[in-house]
């Protein structure tokens, strides 16, 4: 599993999480193709992931990056960390993420770490349970980040003041 990161124009950070070679057996032999999993983010709460497949590695990476740019979401951050503790799952991967104090860093493994880095999360404690398949872990992480709400959004939904929400919760 490789983790190649680079900055591109428009202040987007791109990270290649994994490249897999897959083969299809036909009458004449095997046909090899490649799949790439990438994440893209601006470092300020916007993040997206993409999965691309092609006959050659560069084409697969390019397709994955393009899909990642098209599927970006906004994550409500709180001073470089999460708003509150969250859990989530996708197929066999279960994840737990918890906000951390300043200076902690990103305590997360593998694919989840890449997603959090490009999203702009600087302090978080995270753990993956079950399957550590990079695709499932990235999807679970994205689902959890997408479901997070800021205190302002919660207050608006409940017709309350932000102050009331923050007083009565662990946000």
From Swiss-Prot:
User: Which Gene3D superfamilies does the entry link to?
Assistant: 3.30.160.20, 3.30.230.10
GO BP of this protein: translation
- Ranges for domain S5 DRBM come to 12-75
GO MF terms, alphabetically ordered: rRNA binding; structural constituent of ribosome
Domain of life, per UniProt, equals: Bacteria
Record-level GO cellular component terms: small ribosomal subunit
Quote the Pfam families the UniProt record gives: Ribosomal_S5, Ribosomal_S5_C
Q: Which keywords accompany this UniProt record?
A: Ribonucleoprotein, Ribosomal protein, RNA-binding, rRNA-binding
Recorded hits in InterPro entries, A to Z, give: Ribosomal_Su5_D2-typ_SF, Ribosomal_uS5, Ribosomal_uS5_bac-type, Ribosomal_uS5_C, Ribosomal_uS5_N, Ribosomal_uS5_N_CS, Ribsml_uS5_D2-typ_fold_subgr
Please describe the quaternary structure of this protein.
Part of the 30S ribosomal subunit. Contacts proteins S4 and S8.
Family designation: Belongs to the universal ribosomal protein uS5 family.
Show the PANTHER family listed in the entry: MITOCHONDRIAL RIBOSOMAL PROTEIN S5 (PTHR48277:SF1)
Primary role: With S4 and S12 plays an important role in translational accuracy.
Q: What is known of its domains?
A: The N-terminal domain interacts with the head of the 30S subunit; the C-terminal domain interacts with the body and contacts protein S4. The interaction surface between S4 and S5 is involved in control of translational fidelity.
Name of this protein? Small ribosomal subunit protein uS5
């Amino acid at each position: 599993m490789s983790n190649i990161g680079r900055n591109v124009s428009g202040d987007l950070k791109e990270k290649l999480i994994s490249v897999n070679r897959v083969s299809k057996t036909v009458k004449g032999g095997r046909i090899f193709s490649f799949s790439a999993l990438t994440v893209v983010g601006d470092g300020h709460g916007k993040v997206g992931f993409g999965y691309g497949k092609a006959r050659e590695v560069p084409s697969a990476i390019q397709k994955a990056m393009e899909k990642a740019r098209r599927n970006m979401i906004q994550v409500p951050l709180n001073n470089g960390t999460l708003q509150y503790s969250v859990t989530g799952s996708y197929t066999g991967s279960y994840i737990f993420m918890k906000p951390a104090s300043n200076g902690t860093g990103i305590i997360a493994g593998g694919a989840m770490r890449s997603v959090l880095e490009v999203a702009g999360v600087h302090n978080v404690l995270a753990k993956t349970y079950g399957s550590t398949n990079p695709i499932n872990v990235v999807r679970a992480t994205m689902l959890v980040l997408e479901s997070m709400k800021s205190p302002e959004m919660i207050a608006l939904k409940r017709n309350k003041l932000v102050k009331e929400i923050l007083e009565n919760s662990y946000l």
